């Protein structure tokens, strides 16, 4: 009989920030594993607005179980310490093995490492192993000085019980609430309204698409409760820069959703649309496209970045892009506008014979469920 190892997780829970969601999905699967006795230490959120009331995780089915995990006594010997919060706490740690989760959207992690007031909190513990979510993101930690073998890529996953296709009747009902009829072709983007998400490029592309296809619509679901940047504000800024493109006619066909959605509501939103578009410049992983594909809709994604790790022709059309570097050394991919517009047009005109909903869902089921992803994590904890 195996003796359980004491696993202490230090991080966030109860909210819908991507790190907290990843953490909670992983914990749900790890709790099924008898190899671990799991403890949890809450790391403070960076701002009071990040709270369960305003930004609930939506994981009602197992949030209560996760909330019951407690902090260990000071006397307990910890075998494995796993940190998943921001900034990255690379110092100290009293455990046999220490792992820190982090992402490097721009392949650079300057100012992303925690600097505490205590002397021992100012130095990186060289025995720490880094877990990151994509090969693109891995580069940033290696550039910071971590050894390549000490940076392990474990991707994010999808809960296929939550994210799944909806039937025609449900799709019609949801679209009706959004004042969308069956003849409209709807593009969707779910993200924070920040430069790295490439929303300005998407807005310009949609303005061109709208001129050609009068029945096109765009839905922007922002994360303003977490990041304060609203889609409406981003649209306003982009309109000032491109007044002749973002006309009143174009703007009247852009639907903005700012309120928090439950995961069920988010899944239904994915399923009610016709395509998901992410013309991003820099991402650590980019979970929404994979969730959208699980809900049965095709995606259009920037080529060359983090999403290449889960590319499959059954659900991804690639936007051509050029890798560039900002003055501060941050790397990103600049998506090509014409390639983006072309892909959007091709979807509307159904020119893509490789796109297959059932093949897409099968691909995700074989490679990107949280059960599979968490197995990779637990194997690392045990065998490293």
Q: What feature does the model see in each segment?
A:
Residues 335, 339, 351-381:
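A charged, aromatic-enriched C-terminal amphipathic alpha-helix characteristic of glycosyltransferases
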Residues 228-264:
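Nucleotide-activated donor-binding/catalytic signature segment of Leloir-type glycosyltransferases, i.e.
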Residues 142, 158-177:
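Acidic anion/phosphate-binding donor-loop and adjacent secondary structure
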Residues 8, 181-197, 203-206, 218-219:
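Conserved donor-binding/catalytic core segment of Leloir-type glycosyltransferases
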Residues 298-301, 317:
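Short hydrophobic beta-strand element within catalytic cores of glycosyltransferases
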Residues 8, 49-129, 135-142:
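Extended catalytic core of nucleotide-activated donor transferases of GT-like folds
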Residues 281:
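Aromatic "clamp/platform" in nucleotide-sugar-dependent glycosyltransferases that forms part
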């Amino acid at each position: 009989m195996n003796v359980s190892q004491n696993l202490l997780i230090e991080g966030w829970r109860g909210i819908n920030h991507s790190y907290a969601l990843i953490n909670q999905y992983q914990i749900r699967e790890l709790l099924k594993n008898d190899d671990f006795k799991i403890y949890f230490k809450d790391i403070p959120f960076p701002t009071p607005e990040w709270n369960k009331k305003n930004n609930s995780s939506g994981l009602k089915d197992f949030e209560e179980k996760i909330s019951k995990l407690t902090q260990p006594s000071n006397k307990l010997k910890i075998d494995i310490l796993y940190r998943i919060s921001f900034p990255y706490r690379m110092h100290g740690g009293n455990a046999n093995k220490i792992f820190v989760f982090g992402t490097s959207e721009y392949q650079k992690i300057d100012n992303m490492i925690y600097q505490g007031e205590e002397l021992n909190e100012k130095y990186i513990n060289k025995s720490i192993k880094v877990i990151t979510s994509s090969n693109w993101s891995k580069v940033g930690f290696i550039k910071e000085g971590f050894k390549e073998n000490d940076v392990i890529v474990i991707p994010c996953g999808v809960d296929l019980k939550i994210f799944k296709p909806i039937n025609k009747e449900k799709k019609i009902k949801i679209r009706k609430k959004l004042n969308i009829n069956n003849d409209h072709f709807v593009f969707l983007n779910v993200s924070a309204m920040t430069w790295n998400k490439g929303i300005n490029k998407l807005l310009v592309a949609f303005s061109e698409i709208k001129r050609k296809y009068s029945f096109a619509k765009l839905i922007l679901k922002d994360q303003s409760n977490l990041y304060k940047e609203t889609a409406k504000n981003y649209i306003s800024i982009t309109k000032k820069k491109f007044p002749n493109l973002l006309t009143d006619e174009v703007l009247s066909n852009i639907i903005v959703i700012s309120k928090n959605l439950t995961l069920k509501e988010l899944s239904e939103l994915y399923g009610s649309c016709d395509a998901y578009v992410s013309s991003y410049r820099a991402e650590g992983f980019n979970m929404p496209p994979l969730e959208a594909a699980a809900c049965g809709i095709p995606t259009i994604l920037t080529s060359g970045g983090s999403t290449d790790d889960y590319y499959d022709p059954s659900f991804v059309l690639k936007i051509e892009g050029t890798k560039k570097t900002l003055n501060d050394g941050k790397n990103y991919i600049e998506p090509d506008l014409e390639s983006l517009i072309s892909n959007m047009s091709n979807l509307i005109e159904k020119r893509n014979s490789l796109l297959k909903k059932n093949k897409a869902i099968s691909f995700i089921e074989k490679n990107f469920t949280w059960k599979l992803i968490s197995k990779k994590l637990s194997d690392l904890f045990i065998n490293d």
